[in-house]
Amino acid sequence: MSFLQTPAWGKTKAGWTSQSLGWFVGDELVGAGLILLRKVPKVEKYLAYLPEGPDLNWANSSDVERALKALVVFAKDRGVFQIKMGPHTWVRRWQAETLKSVIALESAKVIGEVPPDEVNQSGIALLSQLKAMGWKQRKAEASGFGDYQPRYVFQIDLAGKTEEQIFEGFNQQWRRNIRKAEKEGVTVRQGTVSDLEIFHTCYLETAKRDHFTPRSLSYFQTMWKAMREETIERIALIIASHPDHDGAIAATTMTRVGNHSWYSYGASTTAARDLRPSNAVQ
């Protein structure tokens, strides 16, 4: 299950109300999800959104049909005029080496043009089923986003690997940058709620440099509080610092559900880039 389907995420989203849903067969829980509702101004209508959800058995077509029909009934009873969802499954998969070779040869402009290494037939069948049921998939933007969430994600399997094995799995340049950061005196630590302010200062600089609209400090404070109340492992803040620079020179937030972690937000300062703190913190 994605962290975007946890009750804590609903508490993070200002302007939305949220409700946790469960699908049952008798007394058995067979599916779960977080539904976000946003009211349309001046009318009693709502937009419903299930980010990276709901958590269903997407490989079973009959289960999917029953679950989504029940979801539509639930939503209509609450004045919902449109439902957005993001089934947490996959259709195509690329290995890192495949993408590296494409980048080196400049043979494709976007990832969708690259022939996949694997195709998930269950995922293809699900797409066909959803279209037949009247659901529509928005075309991915050039940036790789499909509506609100990234259409493509990169996953690294760390299970059973030592820290040394993980380090050796990095490419040569990445290993060199980490060693340089260590040699230059960059230190990395796990932050606390009080460190959100120095993270946010670094994050604002990143937003200005990279031309994106930043989140407010209160957004991160709300997210931290909600997720930490759910479980202390749900969110972590990693800070890189250096004696010659005030505050954070790089930082990232990491969210976690079970054994799966997500890189959520990242930040770095321009002045300390040569120290390679981003490599160290990641």
Q: Model-predicted segments: where are they?
A:
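A conserved beta-strand-loop-helix scaffold within acyl/acetyltransferase catalytic domains
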Residues: 1-44, 87-92, 118, 135-274
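Acyl-donor binding region in acyl/amide transferases
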Residues: 44-146, 258-282
